[in-house]
Amino acid sequence: MVVGDFATKRQLVIIGGGPGGYHAAIRAAQLGLEVTLIEKEKLGGVCLHKGCIPSKSLTQTAANFSGLSHYKQMGISIPEANFEYETFTNYYSSVVTGLQKGVEALIKVNKIEHLTGSASFMSGERIGIDSGHHFEMYEFEHALIATGSNSLLPKQAKLSNRVMTPHTLWELKELPASLVVYGEDYFALEAAMAYKQLGSDVTLIIPADGFSLDSGIEKELLRVLKKNKIKVFKNHQWESAEETADTVAVTLTKDAEEKVSIEASHVLFAAGYSPNVEGLGLEAINVERDENGFIAVNEHSQTSVSNIYAAGDCTIGMKLASKAIKQGKTAAEHMSGLPSAFNLSLVPYVVHTNPPIATVGLTEEQAKSEGYEVKTGQFSMSGNGFASILGQKEGLAKMVIDAKTDVILGIHMMGAGAVDMIQAGTYALEMVAREEDLAYPVYAHPALNEAWLEAIESVSGKAIHVPPARKKEKSTV
C-alpha cells in the first residue's frame, strides 16, 4: 500500500454511491461544487443491485404471470405458460447492468470524481480512502455519509443457499419449492406474494400483530393473502432454524410459551437492518447516533456536526430509496447555501404486491392517537369500471380527514395503479388540501383514479357508486 504525502482538497466528499449518494453528487455538481464520490462496490448501491430493481423485477414478473388467465377471458389465446427462473435472473441482471451504466455515465458527464475504495474519517475535515493498493487523504469542506444498511440475521441462523436475507435472495438459482418469509415490511410482503404467484408454497410469519398499515388496507390485504393461499402467522417470534440437506425447520414462539415448527425448502428473514457504519471512523467526528447506530439528522440532512451530512438507510427512519434520494439532494442544496429541507412524514410508502399498496400521511389509527377528530371515506375497487376492464377488482381507496378543518391527513390505497397514483396524494398533503380540493376537479373516465373521487365523496355520503345503505349520511344537496 502506498500512502499519499498530502491531502487533496474537495468542497464535498460523499461516502456511498447508492441512491442517496449519487443523487447528492449530481445535484452538488449542478450547483457548482467540486465533488468526490467514494463507493467500495458498484455504483447504484443495494437499491440497484440487491433491492429495488431486482425485487420489482420479481414482483412485475409474478404479476404478469398470474394475470395470464385474464387474457383468455378477453379472447386472447395463450399456450400454456411456464416460468423459467434462470431466464428471469438473466432478465433482471440485464436491467441492472443497463441502469448501472447509466449511473456511471451521469457521474462522468457531471465531472464528478469517482473513487473505488473504503473511506474513513480521520477528523472533522479529513477522510482517508483505502483502495487496497493505495491510500489517499482528502480534505473536505463538507462530507455526506450515504453508506446504507445491511440486512440482519438472527444469531441462531447462518446464511446459506437456503437461509437468506433480502440482500442474498438474488443468489437463488431456482424457484423454491416452499418458502417461509419472516417479516412484516414491504419486502416481506412483496416476496411472499411474488413467489406464491410464481408457484412456491409460501408461509408468511409476522412478528407483530400487523403490517403497520391503515386498518382498512390491512383487512383487505389479509383477505387477498388468504385468497392467494398464503399461510399467515401473526405474533410469532423467531427462535431458531435448523437446516438439513433439503429443508430448513424454523421454530417460532408465541407469547413466550407456544412453539410452532414450520419446514420449508427455503427461508427468507426480512426483519431488521443495521447501519453500514463500521470502519467509517465515526468516533473521530462524534456524530450523534441512536441506540442501534443509525445517524441522527435534521430536516436539512445535517448531522450533529454541521459540515457533515447523512442520507438514506444509515440514518434514523424508514429504509426507503425515496427517502435517501430526497435527503441526498436536500443535503447538496443546503450545503450550497439553499434553504432546502424535507418532511419525512410525507414520504409515500409503497408495496409492490399484487394488487399494489400505496400510502402517504396518517392512518386512521395514527390520526386518532394524535388527537384528531377523524372522518373517513372508503371505496372498493370492485366498483371501479376500469379496474373491471383490467380484471383487477381487488383493493380499496381510503381517505382520512380532519373532521374539524376538512384537511386531508392521509390517503391509502390497495389496488391497480396505486403506486403511480399516490404521488397525487403527496401533492395534496404537501399543499394542505381539503376535502373539497379532491372532490371538485373533473376526473377522467373510465380511470382507476375515479376510486379516489368516490372515496372522498363517500366521506359526506355523496359517493355515486356506493349503495345508499352503506352511505354514512344522506346528502343535503
Functional labels for PLM-detected ranges:
Residues 29-48, 200-211:
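Glycine-rich FAD pyrophosphate-binding loop
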Residues 52, 145-205, 231, 283-285, ...:
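Glycine-rich dinucleotide-binding loop and its adjacent helix/turn
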Residues 94-100, 104, 170-171, 176-180, ...:
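Rossmann-like dinucleotide-binding cores of NAD(P)H-dependent redox enzymes
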Residues 160-175, 261-335:
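FAD-site-proximal beta/loop scaffold in flavoenzymes
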